[in-house]
């Protein structure tokens, strides 16, 4: 009997990607985050769709429509908080996924890595425009401050900002177009994720050792489908823990105050997952310099394959590089903390030192340490 799974044009694609896919036998739980990101995206699209059914993208009614969702719509509150906290889970998985790629040298798959960096930028853009939609104080002022950064671009900056705003300030036109962007971008993310997977399956997955696993492959199903389901259960457990017990833990209280252009909040800050980049932006006194540093903090990931000087792919057998990697993680946590603090002593100097260290580790120390390790191994 002919197996439809292996012959049907559509089923064949699914089969080759998720069922009969040859996978390395030794990939650890750090390889779970790709599937978790897929689940996060599906969850965000579904909850977002139901929220969009009740949301109105007008400055007069946006805030009250979100209140209406929470108070009057059946299970509206849980949908809203699953969407808001789902974004946080999305970014936790993203950071883990990127960290895994850096640690185990997955960036040597050039196309997969570069599509991944584009995906990271797209997800960040989606989260930013989404944060503006509830039209609270932090939504309004966050949108004003971040879009204003584009005015640092020489010559065309001011015109560009007014073009994005659709006027001379963040107003009705801005909110409407941000809602449109927020609706379309997740589908672009889904398409990019498919391209990401397509390129990954050209080469096959990396593994913790960083060496070829062609000699020892196992089918993706049932081994890794079961493993992914366990990861998904953990993800849903932690998400629901957040949603049901501390839904506002990661949010800003200022966003429960309707947007008011005449009243600036004492501390304007983005959501927690952008704080590291925000701290780097604030650590440079010059506006254009700050914007360049902000963009570079993510764009530097594109350079990772060029900065790889080690003869080994993975950090698994490179203790000095491992130490440096964990210093980088600690540095990013420090930047995240600083991004949420007011601009005053000693936070300014800590932020500046942490920002310098961030670029120093990636651009200078990593390649040097890798070369030293090569010499120690007599390669």
Swiss-Prot record:
Keyword Metal-binding applies: yes
Entry's cofactor comment: Binds 2 heme b groups non-covalently.
Pfam families documented for this protein: Cytochrom_B_C, Cytochrome_B
Record-listed a ubiquinone binding positions: 201
UniProt keyword tRNA-binding, yes or no: no
Role played: Component of the ubiquinol-cytochrome c reductase complex (complex III or cytochrome b-c1 complex) that is part of the mitochondrial respiratory chain. The b-c1 complex mediates electron transfer from ubiquinol to cytochrome c. Contributes to the generation of a proton gradient across the mitochondrial membrane that is then used for ATP synthesis.
Organism placement in taxonomy: Eukaryota, Metazoa, Chordata, Craniata, Vertebrata
CDD domains the UniProt entry points to: cytochrome_b_C, Cytochrome_b_N
Subcellular location: Mitochondrion inner membrane
Record protein name field: Cytochrome b
Family statement drawn from the similarity comment of this UniProt entry: Belongs to the cytochrome b family.
Note: Heme 1 (or BL or b562) is low-potential and absorbs at about 562 nm, and heme 2 (or BH or b566) is high-potential and absorbs at about 566 nm.
List of residues binding heme b b566: 97, 196
Binding site for heme b b562: 83, 182
Subunit relationships: The cytochrome bc1 complex contains 11 subunits: 3 respiratory subunits (MT-CYB, CYC1 and UQCRFS1), 2 core proteins (UQCRC1 and UQCRC2) and 6 low-molecular weight proteins (UQCRH/QCR6, UQCRB/QCR7, UQCRQ/QCR8, UQCR10/QCR9, UQCR11/QCR10 and a cleavage product of UQCRFS1). This cytochrome bc1 complex then forms a dimer.
Membrane topology: Multi-pass membrane protein
PANTHER family: CYTOCHROME B
Encoding gene per record: MT-CYB
Cofactor(s) the protein needs: heme b
A cellular-component GO term for this protein: mitochondrial inner membrane
